[in-house]
């Protein structure tokens, strides 16, 4: 793993969390229980504090950063999609930030909210609970339905389960030269399917 102390501050990672070896954690970073940090994620706590609360996931290629004297927070069971950028913001409990979205300084995403993929949330935005946000700049278009929240929670559970799966079986290896006969397919732990 790539952990770096910065000006005397060392990242804190709960023993039940999984941090991919290619992720980078610098300085004032706090990672809670059962958190998943994906490949190539960058959590750069060299100005403000970065906090990833229990059960949350920060997926591949995400960036977290913030300003001095601020906390950038992903709340409990937060779900941060591939390539998202979080800068000096707060993501509420059980919220989802879609792939390649950008959440700017001082923005607050409400609990159980969903930010659609490729959205841009402006600095200082203050959302409410259970909003569907989308666009550039993002705006609330409606409330998150019970079905959508259930779908979000199933996806988050997949990542929570992936933590244990990675601890048990992920390791560096050499590639095969050809595909083996009857190669098995990997399965998830829930019945979640892509939202259409």
From Swiss-Prot:
Annotated region (Disordered), positions in chain: 173-196
Compositional bias annotation for Polar residues: 187-196
A biological-process GO annotation: carnitine metabolic process
Swiss-Prot/TrEMBL keywords: Repeat, Transferase
Domain of life: Bacteria
Keyword Aminoacyl-tRNA synthetase belongs to the record: no
InterPro entries reported for this sequence: CaiE, Hexapep, Transf_Hexapept/Carb_Anhydrase, Trimer_LpxA-like_sf
A Pfam family this chain is assigned to: Hexapep
Gene Ontology molecular functions: transferase activity
Pathway note: Amine and polyamine metabolism; carnitine metabolism
PANTHER family reported for this sequence: DYNACTIN SUBUNIT P25, GAMMA CARBONIC ANHYDRASE-LIKE 1, MITOCHONDRIAL-RELATED
Family affiliation: Belongs to the transferase hexapeptide repeat family.
Function per UniProt: Overproduction of CaiE stimulates the activity of CaiB and CaiD.
The protein's name: Carnitine operon protein CaiE
Designated gene of the protein: caiE
């Amino acid at each position: 793993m790539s952990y770096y102390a910065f000006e005397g501050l060392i990242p804190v990672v709960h023993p039940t969390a999984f941090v991919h070896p290619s992720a980078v954690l610098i300085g004032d970073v706090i990672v809670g229980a059962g958190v998943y940090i994906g490949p190539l994620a960058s959590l750069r706590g060299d100005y403000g504090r970065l906090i990833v609360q229990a059960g949350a996931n920060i997926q591949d290629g995400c960036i977290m950063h913030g300003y001095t004297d601020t906390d950038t927070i992903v709340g409990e069971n937060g779900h941060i999609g591939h390539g998202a950028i979080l800068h000096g913001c707060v993501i509420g409990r059980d919220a989802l930030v879609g792939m390649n979205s950008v959440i700017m300084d001082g923005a607050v995403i409400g609990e159980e909210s969903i930010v659609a993929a490729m959205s841009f949330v402006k600095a200082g935005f203050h959302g409410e609970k259970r909003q569907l946000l989308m666009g550039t700049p993002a705006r609330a278009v409606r409330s998150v339905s019970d079905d959508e929240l259930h779908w979000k929670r199933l996806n988050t559970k997949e990542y929570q389960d992936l933590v244990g799966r990675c601890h048990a079986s992920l390791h560096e290896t050499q590639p095969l030269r050809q595909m083996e006969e009857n190669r098995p397919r990997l399965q998830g732990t829930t019945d979640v399917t892509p939202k259409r």
